[in-house]
Amino acid sequence: FAGFVAIQFGSGAFGEYLSGYLIEKSLSVDNVFVWSMLFTTLAIPLKYQHRVLFWGIFGALVLRGIFIGVGSALISRFSWLLVAFGVFLVITGVRIVRHREDEGDVEATRGVGLLGRIMPVSNELDGQKFFTRIGGKRAATPLLAALFVVELTDVIFAVDSVPAILAVSNEPYLVFASNAFAILGLRAMYFLLANAKERFHFLS
């Protein structure tokens, strides 16, 4: 796709796309470890993880599209925001270097607790369903809890990544494309690691 951007839009657009892709990938790679800890904590079998991440990434792309659209509109109206986003990009770079590995575990635990305040959460899976019933009342299954945390953590990461990428490019198409391909690549990366863990248990 990067080659298509270079041919269709020129080297400037190619540079913006590639920069956006690398920023998004470096910031969002934490999602892979959050997903792994989350599925382990909630005992979600690998065969159901595909369903959770399909809807999780679909929702993430919708939310990113909204964030990018709003951010681009704000920059068009208030040009000084570009400077603010540039400063945010520097701060984000520092945060990548000083990243703490336990943050993902904390976010996953808090996310499940937050859903528990909204509605009852069952401890048992009900096939691939997101909802079940406990005592005649509707309740979330661990699958929905996992989906909720996937979306919640993506919103948290998007708050970092979207302003950082908008500091590099204010072209919504390029920003969204770089986000989309980086996020879709994470799903493939996760299942590559998950399948490896199934075969080589010492990786756990």
Please give the residue ranges for each predicted region:
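Multi-pass alpha-helical transmembrane bundle typical of ion/small-solute transporters
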Residues: 1-204
